[in-house]
């Protein structure tokens, strides 16, 4: 089961690769949080994390105006924000060729 609550662990790592491997090893990926003073490290980390929502230097990773949802076994699609409507749509392409007199 996926823990859903205020659970946090502190671990030390030697390399960023170790951090990413440890974070991405789980089948659940609702949210991830990164705390750093380095913008370079921020970009290197968030681009490799497999999570639906990522907070950087904050625990507030989503607002009502932004899409929210998990990755992997933590969910499918997004809720919130104007882009979320796409997850509720079933897009269909219809190519119709009718003779002129059929109109």
Task: Label every model-predicted segment.
Residues 1-103:
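Conserved C-terminal structural/oligomerization subdomain of aldehyde/semialdehyde dehydrogenase
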């Amino acid at each position: 089961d996926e823990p859903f609550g205020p659970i946090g662990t502190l671990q030390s790592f030697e390399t960023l690769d170790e951090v990413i491997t440890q974070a991405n090893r789980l089948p659940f990926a609702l949210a991830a949080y990164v705390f750093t003073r380095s913008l370079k490290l921020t970009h290197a980390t968030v681009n490799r994390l497999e999570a639906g929502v990522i907070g950087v230097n904050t625990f507030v990773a989503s607002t009502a105006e932004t899409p929210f949802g998990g990755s992997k076994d933590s969910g499918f699609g997004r809720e919130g924000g104007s882009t979320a409507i796409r997850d509720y749509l079933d897009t269909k392409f219809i190519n119709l060729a009718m003779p002129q007199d059929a109109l």
